[in-house]
Amino acid sequence: MNPILVAILLGLLQGVLEWIPVSSEGGVALASTVVTGVSPAASTRLALFLHAGTAVAATAYYRTEVRTILHSIRQLSRRPFADETADLSFIVIATAATAVTGLPAYMVLDAAVSELEGGLFLALVGGLLVITGLLQRFAAALSLGEREIPDGFDAVLVGVLQGLAILPGVSRSGTTVSALLLRGHEGESSLRLSFLLSIPAALAANVLVLVDDGIPAIEPLPAVVALIVSAVVGYLTVDALVRLVRQVPFWAVCTVFGGLGVVGGLLVAL
């Protein structure tokens, strides 16, 4: 197949799959292996590389929040997790927790953990989303409290889970959003925190990939095309998802996406 068409396909997949509870890394790597015939290891490195495109999309979509976070850096040491520094504190601590768990998980478990285990974990995440959706549906009747800003426990929990999401078949967004929802954050806030957290994680993964092997499994021009497509499609799809959350009861979104996660995880496992 024409390399540019392959690049468009892979960028499209990355842009769509990044935000939903299906492993974008697994989907892009599988498509790359099937279409181009490169090794699974090279395809996985390419999938990690394409996260830079959706990181750009998240930065552009949440540009106001990113600007506010950068402006709050000076206040971080004096007032961590205050209203104006909560997002920055969350991202810094969660990113550190991701590094602490993600690097050892990659080095120790990457060769040992099978697609079966990753698929079952993704199905578990999907099941948690379904349960979360049902809890959201009956939250008012059960008088479940809501959290308005993240705290240190949220940051450590979500960061650890994001680090473990490097395992085969595990959805980063599905895992982190599920954790935030179960901690009492409302739907749009959970998406926002998860997507903001994806920016430093994706950029760090790209640095590792480029330092290790350079641009993997693809020529420079198709790589640029794939990045552009993933950024544009990622921006459009994250906007569509946020709009959906604003217009549709989030318990329904959780339930549907959780069902997708269960089905996707079982398909990987089988």
UniProtKB/Swiss-Prot annotation:
Topological relation to the membrane, as annotated: Multi-pass membrane protein
Keyword Transmembrane: yes
Entry GO MF terms: undecaprenyl-diphosphatase activity
Known EC number: 3.6.1.27
Domain of life (superkingdom): Archaea
Enzyme class, spelled out: hydrolase
Catalytic activity: di-trans,octa-cis-undecaprenyl diphosphate + H2O = di-trans,octa-cis-undecaprenyl phosphate + phosphate + H(+)
Swiss-Prot/TrEMBL keywords: Cell membrane, Hydrolase, Membrane, Transmembrane, Transmembrane helix
Residue ranges the record marks as coiled coil: none
Transmembrane segments: 88-108, 115-135, 149-169, 191-211, 214-234, 250-270
CC annotations in GO: plasma membrane
Protein localization: Cell membrane
A Pfam family reported for this protein in Swiss-Prot or TrEMBL: BacA
Principal place of residence: membrane
Similarity comment: Belongs to the UppP family.
Record function comment: Catalyzes the dephosphorylation of undecaprenyl diphosphate (UPP).
Name of the protein described by the UniProt record: Undecaprenyl-diphosphatase
Annotated gene: uppP
